[in-house]
């Protein structure tokens, strides 16, 4: 049985709740001592993990829609991507304001350059910013064929973000490895597409170098 447009609308409402409820929990935890001994790190890790969850969910939609033969599921992909960006922005903000502090924001640029795992994180965020800004149908029409080329960069985020997470933790635990493994699996499902993109990029680079 195929999903109807009305059912997809209710699914979107549920996904909005899934994006909002973790924020409400975080606010409650901050105000009621629900965090650990290092609340700043807990906030950073929580926001980062939630962004990763929405990134993985975004990548899951296309293969899932094909597997269960529910093409209307694709309509939820943009919503999930926007929640990924929202949580990634909270993650970056928590680092800038809580780790560095308002008085030390001038150090942010230096930190992002001198710490490789932060460099990967900010690259991922900038890509997500571009994808969020161009996610509307109007931007899709305006960019034409370049829209899909731009949004293929989500696969780069799927590589960089788990590495950023693994690199940022002092002690490797199962959790970041699980996120990395899921990202690899979701990318592996797109092996043919990624191979085609890589070959096309390699050809373009070769042609430019040959000029």
From Swiss-Prot:
One Pfam family linked to the record: Ferric_reduct
Annotated membrane topology: Multi-pass membrane protein
Chain segments annotated as transmembrane: 17-37, 54-74, 82-102, 116-136, 153-173
GO MF annotation terms: electron transfer activity; FMN binding; heme binding; metal ion binding; oxidoreductase activity, acting on diphenols and related substances as donors
GO CC annotation: plasma membrane
Compartment(s): Cell inner membrane
Highest rank taxon of the organism: Bacteria
Cofactor: FMN; heme b
Role of this protein: Part of the MsrPQ system that repairs oxidized periplasmic proteins containing methionine sulfoxide residues (Met-O), using respiratory chain electrons. Thus protects these proteins from oxidative-stress damage caused by reactive species of oxygen and chlorine generated by the host defense mechanisms. MsrPQ is essential for the maintenance of envelope integrity under bleach stress, rescuing a wide series of structurally unrelated periplasmic proteins from methionine oxidation, including the primary periplasmic chaperone SurA and the lipoprotein Pal.
The protein, known as: Protein-methionine-sulfoxide reductase heme-binding subunit MsrQ
Gene: msrQ
